[in-house]
Curated annotation (Swiss-Prot):
GO terms for biological process: formation of cytoplasmic translation initiation complex; translation reinitiation. The keyword rRNA-binding does not apply. Residues 890-906 have a biased composition (Basic and acidic residues). Residues 919-932 have a biased composition (Low complexity). It comes from Candida glabrata (strain ATCC 2001 / BCRC 20586 / JCM 3761 / NBRC 0622 / NRRL Y-65 / CBS 138) (Yeast). Component of the eukaryotic translation initiation factor 3 (eIF-3) complex. The gene is TIF32. This is Eukaryotic translation initiation factor 3 subunit A. InterPro entries: EIF3A, eIF3a_PCI_TPR-like, PCI_dom.
């Protein structure tokens, strides 16, 4: 079925006509109906876009936010199925935001122009009781301060429009770029008009969109946002950078911190490093966030990160570097003292991850890292370095005040000093209190106050100084006794000295308590003997429950710690602050050991409990298995007994049923037999009631006895009936024969007629077929000669073609066979030649060895003969002179000559060239053996015998 026709130009024309007659609401409604109609799904989005643009323009002008929202949702629902439709949705929403921003700007310009025209002389904007009361009854609220309602309504409309656009664009991979653009424009709207509440809702909305996108990563769906894509992740990261920047500009520090956490998590996911300028701006915002939070360590670390990135800026000047370096160093000096160890939970531990710091660094570590970093410390101004020297390196409480007041005016002249003056003042005052506690045992209040009273912005009242002193005592940096009557402060040198006196008092109190307990026990025993076993006596002797107080436990532990620390010789020689540090470290170590012991004990208890539970479970499982077996056995026995009873009952019922069925069959047969006998009409009738208790044979016998009376008469009747039936049958057949013959003649005549008709039809059909075939034959016979000629020519051409192909294939086959035969012959010849050469070499080697053996044998014989001859001469002429070895030398010479001749002969044979390959069969060589493939049988046999002989 074809889609319904769509005429966008008609809808536009209709809307223009309604607008021309000042019926804009009706025009808006007509466009709304057209956009939300289902038939637009069959049209291309480019056809519908002009209608939507016109609708949005008119809707924004009339401020119909709900109608626009519904229309946009319906439009997206109808066209989002295709990529072109999603592109159209993005274009429509961008146009919508353009219309809204243009309209808001025009309305704001109108409001400003109107406010300029209505200038009042009243400095308070014309807000007086009189015109305030009169404005209630007037339609035009022109009083200054009350004429912004229209503009506020347009701002609310703009905010709702931004929300609608973001909701339509969220979590769609095809609309990511448009979504990012609308997010940026929404932030600019909140910044421009200082809409803090709307900005909070925007931040929450963006966070929900990101959570939803992350949640849908593992689910299947079309156009899902892929957070593993680098471009997508970068867009989300850029949005969070803008969110941090806008939050800081609006002063929404909580939102800025949340956005910074989002930036941290997104940067962990991405592999693409953001731009240095973007990161520098981000860390600059973190500097302000941590400054407001009051955490100076985080503030200083953020400054360092910012300086590292800002140092890569080619446009930065040395003056800016010096200012930033001085600010960083001053912020580090403003970090509150953290000389004492503590185990409090750090609520800012999550914030350190934002700066890629695993654990919280100490104040000393932060300052030392800046001092060691030459790129920062070398650019710090002289006054700040001097402050570092007098505060950290060479602190002297007596001379500090003069040195500090000398550089204070220059420091106050710097623009960055105001942010750190309060925290720096607290650090300096805390150090002065610690110095005073170490140097003096007691000091007058006036002297103490004057030592920490500075000029200008560092000046505090006595009340504030006393608060600082109390706070230092709370933080355990000093311990003192304040005497306002004598106007002096007495510093305590040992933080645990009071617990020694407490311990002595506690020992006395414990002895008194023990004596009181013994007296109470005696009184209780006497009361028990007097009252016997009565209930009142039992209540009287009931032991009171002990009350354990936490303060008592703490005092006891501290007194034990004090006794332990007194054994350390260094404890008595150090200052109060060092004693507190030592005590805290000892307490922390003891607590850690206690916790470790508790953990081990709890783990051991858990293991024991687990083991007991396992054993209990195993025993329970075994018992349960035994119980289950017994229960199963009992159930089987009960089931077997029940089945036996049921089987017995079923057998009994079956027997009864068979008996009933047999009785019913018997009675039915008796009734049937009685009916049959009575139906024969032999003159004898038997009643059912007479024979119902009899058996079948008895009934038959009974009936036969009843019939025996008329037996003779019955036999006579039967014989007569048989004879009568025989004559009747013969009469029937005699009459029937002529009729049957007549019927057969009629059937024969009918068959002959049908046969003639059928034969005629077959003959006619055969003749017609023959004539048709003869006609075809005569028609084809005229062209038969041509057909035969064409056939012969085609057969000849075909045979000639196939003969050529066959001859070619035969030639190829023959050539291949010859090549293969030649290859096999050559291979066999080479194998035979190699084998013959090897055998020949072996024979020559054997011959050479035999000759060498023979020469050696002859040499041995000659040597033996010479030895025998020499021995004989020695025996016959013992005193004759020794004969020269001339004969032996001659023999050796001859032997060497023979060996050299044999070696030359063998070398000549081995150096002879190998025989050439066998020549063609047409020219065989007479002196060389024929190739293996061309030898005769006799030649092959002769060669074989030669090889066997050589072996």
């Amino acid at each position: 079925m074809a889609p319904p026709p769509l005429r966008p130009e008609n809808a536009l024309k209709r809307a223009d006509e309604l607008i021309s007659v000042n019926e804009k609401p009706a025009a808006l409604q007509s466009l709304y109906e057209f956009i939300t109609a289902r038939r637009i799904r069959y049209a291309t989005p480019s056809q519908v876009e002009p209608i939507v643009f016109k609708f949005l323009e008119l809707g924004v002008e009339l401020k119909k936010g709900k109608l626009i929202k519904d229309a946009l949702y319906q439009y997206k629902k109808l066209v989002h199925g295709s990529a072109e439709g999603l592109v159209s949705v993005g274009a429509v929403l961008r146009k919508f935001i353009d219309y809204v921003e243009t309209k808001l700007a025009s309305e704001q310009a109108k409001a400003e122009e109107k406010q300029k025209e209505e200038v009042s002389d009243d400095l308070e904007g014309g807000v007086t009781p009189e015109n305030l009361l009169s404005s209630v009854y007037e339609a035009d609220h022109s009083v200054a301060g009350f004429n912004d309602e229209a503009l506020n309504s347009w701002m609310r409309f703009s905010w709702e429009s931004y929300r609608t656009a973001l909701d339509l664009l969220r979590n769609n991979s095809q609309l990511e770029i448009t979504y990012s653009g609308v997010v940026s424009r929404t932030m600019q709207f909140c910044l421009k008009h200082q809409r803090k509440n709307e900005f909070k809702r925007l931040a929450e909305m963006l966070r929900q969109h990101l959570d939803t996108a992350n949640y849908h990563q593992s689910k299947f769906g079309s156009n899902q946002v892929d957070l593993s894509d680098a471009d997508t992740l970068q867009r989300y990261l850029d949005q969070r950078f803008q969110l941090v920047d806008a939050s800081v500009k609006l002063g929404l520090w909580h939102e800025a911190y949340k956005a910074a956490e989002d930036v941290y998590h997104l940067m962990k996911m991405t592999t693409r490093k953001p731009k240095s300028s973007t990161l520098a701006n981000y860390f600059e915002n973190l500097v302000q966030i941590f400054l407001v939070s009051g955490d100076q360590i985080l503030h200083t670390l953020a400054w360092k990160k910012y300086f590292e990135l800002y140092s890569t800026n080619p446009n930065a000047t040395e003056e800016e570097f010096k200012k930033i370096a001085s600010t960083i160093f001053l912020s580090a000096l403003s970090i509150q003292l953290d000389d004492l160890p503590n185990v409090r939970y750090n609520y800012q531990s999550r914030s350190y991850r934002l700066l890629d710091v695993e654990t919280k660094p100490t104040r000393k570590e932060v300052i030392q890292s800046i001092v060691e970093d030459d790129t920062i410390f070398s650019r710090v101004d002289a006054e700040t370095k001097t402050l570092y020297e007098i505060m950290e390196v060479e602190f002297d409480g007596e001379s500090f005040k003069g040195k500090f007041e000398a550089i204070l005016p220059k420091l106050e002249g710097e623009s960055y000093f105001a942010n750190y003056s309060v925290s720096l003042r607290d650090v300096i005052i805390r150090r002065m209190f610690v110095f005073a506690s170490q140097k003096y045992e007691d000091i007058s209040l006036n002297d103490l106050y004057s030592s920490v009273t500075f000029s200008s912005s560092f000046k505090l009242s006595e009340w504030d100084i006393e608060k600082q002193l109390l706070q230092a005592a709370v933080d355990d940096y000093v311990s003192f006794q304040l005497d306002h009557e004598q106007n002096k402060v007495t510093f305590v040198k040992d933080p645990l000295v009071n617990f020694a006196a407490i311990k002595e008092e506690e020992v006395e109190e414990e002895e008194e308590e023990e004596e009181e307990e013994e007296e109470e026990e005696k009184e209780a025993e006497g009361a028990e003997g007097a009252e016997g076993d009565t209930e009142e006596g039992q209540e009287a002797v009931a032991e009171p429950e002990p009350v354990i107080k936490r303060n008592y436990y703490i005092r006891k532990r501290l007194s034990e710690l004090y006794e332990k620390l007194l054994e350390d010789t260094d404890y008595n020689t150090v200052s109060y602050l060092d004693k507190v540090r030592i005590a805290r470290e000892a307490l922390i170590k003891h607590t850690k050991d206690t916790i470790e012991d508790m953990k081990k004990n709890s783990e051991e208890r858990a293991k024991m409990h687990q083991e007991r539970r396992r054993q209990h479970m195993e025993s329970a499982a075994m018992n349960a298995e035994k119980d289950a077996e017994q229960r199963q056995k009992r159930i089987m026995e009960e089931r077997a007994s029940i089945e036996a009873k049921l089987e017995e009952e079923a057998h009994r019922r079956l027997i009864e049923k068979k008996k009933r069925e047999f009785e019913e069959v018997k009675q039915r047969e008796i009734r049937k037999l009685v009916d049959e006998l009575n139906a024969k009409g032999n003159g004898t009738k038997v009643e059912y009631d007479e024979v119902k208790d009899m058996d079948i044979p008895d009934i038959t016998k009974y009936f036969v006895n009843r019939l025996s009376k008329n037996k003779d008469e019955l036999e006579e009747r039967m014989n007569f009936a048989v004879k009568r039936m025989d004559h009747l049958e013969r009469a029937y057949r005699k009459v029937e024969l002529p009729l049957l013959k007549k019927q057969a003649d009629e059937l024969r005549a009918t068959d002959e007629v049908n046969f003639g008709n059928m034969k005629k039809k077959i003959v006619d059909a055969a003749k017609a077929e023959y004539e048709a075939k003869m006609e075809d034959y005569n028609r084809v016979s005229s062209v038969f000669d041509d057909y035969k000629t064409l056939r012969d020519r085609m057969l000849a051409a075909h045979n000639e073609k196939f003969a050529a192909i066959r001859a070619e294939n035969a030639a190829k086959l023959e050539a291949a066979k010859k090549a293969r035969i030649e290859e096999v012959r050559k291979q066999r010849y080479e194998e035979l030649l190699a084998r013959s050469e090897a055998e020949k070499k072996a024979a020559e080697e054997a011959e050479r060895r035999a000759k060498l053996d023979e020469i050696a044998r002859k040499q041995r014989e000659m040597e033996e003969a010479l030895e025998r001859k020499s021995a004989a001469r020695t025996f016959t002429q013992p005193r004759a002179p020794v004969v020269p070895n001339a004969n032996l030398d001659e023999i050796a010479r001859k032997q060497r000559e023979m060996e050299e001749a044999i070696e030359r002969k063998l070398a000549g044979k081995s150096a002879a060239p190998a025989p050439a390959p066998a020549p063609a069969a047409s020219t065989p060589a007479a002196s060389t053996p024929a190739a293996p493939g061309k030898m005769s049988f006799a030649e092959r046999m002769r060669l074989k015998r030669q090889q066997q002989q050589q072996k």
